[in-house]
Amino acid sequence: MQKLLLDPALRNWVLLPIMFVMILIGILRHNATILLQSSPKKLSKEEIREQRLLQRAYALRACSNSLLPESIEARKCFLIESLKSGKYLKPVDPNAPKAANPLMDDKTLEGLMESMKGNMLMVVPQTIIMTWINEFFSGFILLKLPFPLTLRFKSIFQSGVATQDLDVQWVSSISWYFLNLFGLKSVYALLLGENNAASNATNEMGMAGFSSAAATAQLIQPGQDISKMMLSEAENVQILKNESLLVDVEKRLLAQFA
C-alpha cells in the first residue's frame, strides 16, 4: 500500500487548533460551572441526625466483617432500636402544608436546576465544536497512530472518512475530536486540579457530586418517607449475619508462617 504524506499545514492549522480549542473550552467550562453553581442549602441539625443514622446502618452492613462478632451484635442492637423507635426522626410540624406533587418540592427543583446547568455547560460547547469541525475540517486525515490496530477500530478512528482501503492507523479530524474529548482528563487535572468540572463533565452529565455537601444531601431524596426508610433499614440490619474475618485470625496467621 502506498504511504500517505500529510501536509505539515494540517498539523499547524487543524490538529493543534482542535486540541487547543478543546483545552480552552474545558477551562471555560470549569470556571463557568463554579460561577453558576449555587451553594447547597445547609441542613438542619435534625436532618443531619437522620442522615448520619442511616449512614451508620449502611456502613455496618458494608463493613461488618471487619468487626468482632460481639461488636457487630452490639451495633445491631443499637441501630435496630434507634431505627424502629424513630427517636432520631425530625419532628413533623402538623400545620405544615404537604406538597401535592413531590416534583414541586424546593429541593427537587433545586436539583433539577443544577442538573440543567450542568447539561447546558456540557452540551452547548460540544455542539459548537462539532459544528465547527464538521464545517471546516470534515474529511481531513490528521495523523497516523504509531501502533497497528484491527479493522474493528476503523469506524472509531476514521469517522467521517468514506475510504475502505485506508489503513486503520490513520485518524480523521472528527475522531481526533473524540480522542481529545476523552483523553484530556490528565491535562485538565494538571491545569485545574483533580476535582475539576472539565473532566467531570465527560463522566457525569451535570454537577452532582461536585461538592461533598451536595453528595450528602443526595442520601435522602425529596419526597421520600424517612420513617419508612428507617424501618426498611432496620430489617436489613436485623438479618445481617455476624460473620467476621477476625475470628481465629491469630491461628490463621500462625499457620500461614509456620
Swiss-Prot record:
Membrane topology, from the record: Multi-pass membrane protein
Database matches in InterPro entries: EMC3 (IPR008568), EMC3/TMCO1 (IPR002809)
Ranges annotated as spanning the membrane: 8-28, 123-143, 173-193
Sorted UniProt keywords: Cytoplasm, Membrane, Transmembrane, Transmembrane helix
Pfam families referenced in this protein's UniProt entry, alphabetically: EMC3_TMCO1
GO biological process: protein insertion into ER membrane
A GO CC term assigned to this protein in UniProt: cytosol
Protein name in the entry: ER membrane protein complex subunit 3
Native species: Schizosaccharomyces pombe (strain 972 / ATCC 24843) (Fission yeast)
